């Protein structure tokens, strides 16, 4: 049985190549506001939500014991299909759960 809930978030899944690619696509957006440059930027796990596009909640390892939680909206192909960062939470740790914000 699928874990897709219409309008709901999936369970947390291990990050894959697609998730890492999304992170690479939005890294510059994430670094803009706090004006930080992350040498490490590796997707660890994620959740997703199908809306008029796809919302992603991604845990990203940025070095040492530091993690970010990213909210990324992936637009539908008819709307250019781009990823846009809609939220960033700093100061997370490896075992922190991914909770929509």
Question: How does the language model describe each region?
Answer:
Residues 1-101:
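N- and C-terminal low-complexity/disordered segments
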């Amino acid at each position: 049985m699928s874990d897709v809930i219409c309008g709901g978030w999936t369970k947390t899944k291990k990050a894959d190549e697609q998730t890492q690619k999304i992170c690479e696509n939005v890294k510059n957006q994430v670094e803009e506001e706090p004006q930080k440059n992350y040498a490490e930027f590796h997707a660890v796990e994620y959740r997703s939500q199908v809306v008029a596009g796809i919302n992603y909640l991604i845990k990203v390892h940025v070095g040492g014991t530091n993690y970010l939680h990213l909210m990324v909206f992936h637009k539908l192909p008819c709307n250019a299909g781009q990823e846009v960062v809609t939220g960033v939470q700093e100061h997370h740790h490896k075992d922190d759960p991914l909770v929509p914000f």
